[in-house]
A protein has these predicted regions:
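Phosphate-backbone binding interfaces of nucleic-acid-interacting proteins
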Residues: 1-216, 352, 371, 375, ...
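Short, hydrophobic beta-strand segments
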Residues: 2-8, 170-179, 234-242, 375-383, ...
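Glycine/proline-enriched, intrinsically flexible loops and inter-domain linkers
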Residues: 5, 23, 63, 203-306
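Conserved mixed alpha/beta core segments that line enzyme active sites in large multi-domain catalysts
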Residues: 47-77, 159, 255, 266, ...
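Mobile "lid/hinge" segments at catalytic clefts and subdomain interfaces of large enzymes
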Residues: 121-130, 134-136, 164-165, 172, ...
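Terminal amphipathic helices with adjacent charged low-complexity linkers/tails
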Residues: 199-227, 404-432, 438-439
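Extended, well-folded interaction surfaces typified by the phenylalanyl-tRNA synthetase beta subunit core
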Residues: 425-429, 433-589, 783-785, 791, ...
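A carboxyl-terminal module marker
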Residues: 434, 451-457, 477, 539, ...
């Protein structure tokens, strides 16, 4: 936000140096970027008048001008400017003068550019006629009338007077960085309020008192306003101006816009921009002859609707974009830019002034989709107080009246369905002092809060505070504590050291996550991090069932757009996006994982906190990867985390995964012996892969819940002496049904093997010519050992045969010859 000090003085008397002003504003919490002093490098540049113009004898594109600078004799200057004419008042850089620059087509020089007399194609020139750019103004703020050529003055000034003095060009402009939570400071009035509190001086609001409403009729006679989407348009105020004269703005108005970073266009547009900078409330003016039927209708555009904006670009709209329409067509994209079909022209005689409030989320979505960001959209995106609309509209009318640009009709058309009200809360004097570590009297706090236009009631320790509706950031007691702290002065806070003992240590949850990261990175996986704000369409892409908990989203109040409008409930959609992004960049193998928060709104109530927990998602693809690659990673991770005897139970359909190639992962709880689900894993469903542009690619994913892992993790290391007695192994190959899970076979073997069965290891799964259809062969190595003696063949055979009998009778497993 560019704040010219001269302009700020209209609202508050700044009687300190520019340096002190900046220092004190910083100490009261304002983030200051730069303080630039304009035209400090300008010397010996005066106001001159072109008395006579002659053609250059030796150059078609040059002319020789005789310039009256208030002395006895005119001076001669040769120029190639196309817009000079006899009688024009212009800035004249004399011999040995200095201008800020840069000269046309040259880079800017530190310390400015020195101008001396010389000859141009044989004709003497005793100085230079200057453009606005050569006097230090950026091209983007140069008035349209002076964009090409020499700066032609519209008003009379004494000839020979110092140019910077005549036009009051030497002044300071402070650039403040405005944080997203303080949209009220994107306005001169907002910065005046901050300065008032900082310097303990009163400030005044702009004059909005219209002296004569002498336009023909009333505003309601010309226009009606209908809001069809009150969620996206909270208020719409329209005022009508007749007998409009579209012309250049007076210099004082142009100058303020230029120093604030905006290009002057014409008096009507300039006044609306001026008031936007004053109040932070964007405004727009329509030519009433182009508003069909005298109707203003605020509603969403139709999907695919075409609309041409003021910049001449035809744009395709979608049905989530808010449009201002008349009785027949769209005339403006709400909060972003007006339409070419209702633009103010030189012959416009009657206008409608729009002062409306559009929802930040709606404007942000529209602006982002169209790739069109304007001063108006930047303000609406951050949130604007609907109560500004009327004052801003009246201020426009007052300036039109003051500049003679038109006649104001009586009244306004104000559609305000649900008036905005401030939130009143109680704050405590003792808590403010306790948090800040100071001892302020109650009255000091009251004075500070009132200087920010916060109403204070109550008595004793309790202060009942009501902020102005423009301060949408003041919601909790802590917000008011911050206000007291910054206006009191951070530099006045006593420096103290923390007291008490601090116990070092890492919480168990974090230690578990850190161990998981180390383990997975050690296995060659790469960690990724993605946004918690996601699109609700993500769960559709992974084939999540309707009504499932994964669809219980936490919705953002002020999202960046639909693709970032909810908090994620699962990590898999984000993982799929990352895998797809790598795949499209010809990365032939990816093994990745993410550990992040998920948020589930189980109650669907806005005032109840969502269930939040950490989750782990593993994703991989590549020619060497398969289901068992992923399972091996998960099993090794469980070993490190102390998850004993995990169960991988095959599932026919888990939505996101390939039917028959996925499993639920669980573990038997030590508390009640019931299975506890840890997560799911498997090969990603082909339809899901296709959604992400990976058609035909075999992708493997796993998602685990950290709460369940933490509750069932036992990383206690118990001492076990090295075995004294040897082990013996038996290999078995079993012919079983195709759909029989290996986990069930292993569980039965462990159960029947008893205490001497030390280990069971699967080493082969075979399907082929020697195995009949519908069957598979699975082979295990069984290791036996007794800690108290050396096992005999009879000891082993007794237990081993018991295992085989159980497999045959309970699972119909047939022993194959090895």
């Amino acid at each position: 936000m560019l704040v010219p000090i001269e302009w700020l003085n209209d609202y508050i008397d700044i009687d300190v140096s520019d340096e002190e002003f900046c220092d004190r504003m910083i100490m009261s919490g304002s983030n200051l970027e730069t303080c630039e002093h304009f035209c400090e490098e300008m010397e010996r540049v005066v106001v001159g008048k072109i008395e006579k113009i002659e053609k250059h004898p030796d150059a078609d594109k040059l002319v020789v001008c005789q310039i009256n600078i208030g002395e006895e004799e005119p001076i001669q200057i040769v120029t190639g400017a196309p817009n000079v004419f006899e009688g024009a008042l212009v800035p004249v850089a004399l011999h040995k003068s200095r201008i800020p620059g840069p000269l046309h087509g040259q880079p800017k020089q530190e310390g400015g550019v020195k101008i001396t007399k010389g000859k141009l194609r044989g004709v003497e020139s005793f100085g230079m006629l200057c453009s606005a750019g050569e006097l230090g103004f950026d091209d983007k703020v140069v008035p349209v009338a002076h964009k090409d050529g020499i700066w032609i003055l519209e008003e009379e000034y004494p000839l020979g007077q110092d140019f910077a003095e005549a036009l009051q060009l030497k002044q300071a402009v402070v650039d403040f960085e405005i944080t997203p939570n303080r949209p009220d400071c994107l306005a001169m009035v907002g910065m005046a309020r901050e300065a008032s509190a900082t310097f303990k001086k009163p400030f005044s609001y702009p004059d909005t008192a219209i002296q004569k409403e002498d336009g023909e009729g009333e505003s309601k006679d010309y226009v009606s306003v209908e809001i069809k989407n009150p969620e996206s348009c909270k208020r719409y105020v329209a005022r009508v101006i007749t007998d409009v004269k579209v012309e250049q703005s007076p210099w004082w108005l142009q100058k303020r816009l230029m120093y604030a970073g905006m290009r002057p266009i014409n008096n009507i547009v300039d006044i609306t921009n001026f008031v936007m900078l004053e109040y932070g409330q964007p405004l727009h003016a329509f030519d009433i002859n182009q508003v069909k039927g005298g109707k203003i209708i605020v509603e969403n555009a139709k999907d695919g609707e075409m609309f041409t904006t003021l910049d001449g670009t035809e744009r395709t709209l979608t049905d989530d974009m808010l449009l201002i329409k008349d009785a027949e067509r769209g005339i403006a994209i709400a909060g972003v830019m007006g339409g070419l079909n209702s633009e103010i022209e030189e012959d416009t005689k009657t206008i409608i002034v729009e002062s409306a409030n559009f929802a930040g989320s709606s404007v942000r979505t529209t602006s982002k989709k169209l790739g069109l960001r304007t001063e108006a959209s930047a303000r609406f995106e951050k949130g604007i107080d609907p109560n500004l609309c009327e004052a801003a509209a009246d201020r426009v009318c007052r300036l039109i009246e003051l500049t003679g640009a038109g006649k104001v009709c009586k009244g306004s058309v104000d559609n305000y369905p649900v008036p905005e009200e401030a939130k009143t809360i109680d704050i405590r004097v003792d808590r403010i002092n306790r948090v800040l570590g100071i001892e302020l009297e109650r009255q000091e706090m009251v004075d500070i809060l009132k200087s920010l236009e916060i109403k204070v009631a109550g008595s004793g320790n309790i202060m009942t505070v009501t902020p102005p509706t423009i301060r949408q950031d003041l919601l909790e007691e802590e917000d008011y504590i911050e206000e007291v702290a910054r206006i009191y002065g951070y530099d006045k806070m006593p420096v103290t050291l923390p007291k008490g003992n601090t116990e070092a240590g890492i919480p168990e949850d974090r230690a578990l996550r850190d161990l998981t990261r180390d383990s997975l990175c050690g296995m060659g996986l790469n960690e990724i991090q993605t946004y918690s704000f996601v699109s609700p369409k993500g769960v559709d892409y992974i084939r999540t069932a309707e009504g499932s908990w994964e669809r219980n989203f936490v919705k953002l109040i002020n999202p960046l757009g639909e693709e970032n409008s909810v908090m994620r409930t699962v990590l898999m959609p984000n993982m799929m996006e990352v895998l797809a992004r790598n795949y499209t960049r010809n990365i032939d193998k990816v093994n990745a994982f993410e550990i992040g928060n998920t948020f589930v709104n189980n109650t669907q109530e806005d005032d109840v906190l969502p269930y939040e927990q950490y989750a782990l998602c593993i994703g991989m693809y590549g020619k060497d990867e398969d289901f068992y690659s992923l399972k091996g990673v998960v099993e090794e991770l469980f070993r490190v985390l102390g998850i004993k005897d995990p169960i991988f139970a095959g599932e026919a359909d888990l939505g996101a995964f390939h039917p028959g190639r996925c499993a639920r992962i669980s573990v038997i709880s030590g508390e009640n012996g019931e299975p506890v689900q840890l997560g799911v894993m498997g090969e990603v469903h082909p339809d899901v892969a296709e959604q992400y542009g990976m058609e035909g690619v075999r992708i493997y994913c796993c998602e685990l819940m950290f709460d369940a892992i933490r509750d069932n993790s036992d990383r206690t290391i118990l001492y076990t002496p090295l075995p004294k007695y040897p082990s013996t192994s038996r290999d078995i190959a079993l012919l079983v049904e195709e759909n029989l899970e290996v986990g069930r076979i292993e569980a039965l073997i462990r159960k029947e093997g008893g205490r001497i069965l030390e280990n069971v290891k699967l080493f082969d799964v075979y399907r082929g010519k020697q195995v009949e259809e519908g069957k598979k062969s699975v082979a295990f190595t069984l290791t036996y050992r007794d800690k108290d003696k050396t096992l005999t063949d009879e000891d082993v055979a007794k237990v081993h045969n018991k295992v085989l009998e159980a497999l045959e009778h309970k699972l119909n497993a047939v022993l194959r010859e090895m």
